[in-house]
Design a protein with these regions (language model features):
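Macromolecular interaction modules
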Residues: 1-121
């Protein structure tokens, strides 16, 4: 299984509650509406919570501030990913997603990468 991991930071001009609300209530349904076009089989949003516990983990490890959340998108096969990223409808869906992401995500402080999952337990 192929997975995209997208570590998000909100734009500075958006408050935290508005960021989470938009991501969940506006962007989430948009992703669902184009899932077939991009060939995705699963989409999960993980919203950062428990600031006190996060701060303890950061301090104990000497890490930087946490991301505001993480998006994960799965494709069942490399073929599904390639088809979803190269078909005309997939390319248009990606354009829509990126355009919408610019409304609430600070691209310069966020990170995205592709992975192959290895389930341990």
């Amino acid at each position: 299984m192929i997975k995209l991991v997208y570590c998000l930071r909100k734009r500075n001009d958006i408050d935290t509650d508005s960021f989470y609300r938009y991501w969940l209530d506006e962007h989430g349904p948009l992703v669902k509406s184009v899932a077939e076009e991009i060939g995705a089989s699963r989409y999960v949003q993980s919203h950062t919570k428990l600031p006190e516990l996060n701060q303890l983990m950061i301090e104990s490890r000497g890490l930087k501030a946490p991301y505001d959340g993480v998006t994960e998108v799965w494709w069942d096969t490399m073929t599904a990913l390639e088809r979803g990223m190269s078909s005309p409808s997939g390319v248009e869906a990606q354009r829509k997603l990126i355009e919408d992401e610019a409304r609430f995500i600070d691209f310069s402080r966020s990170r995205v990468f592709m992975t192959e999952e290895h389930e341990i337990f």
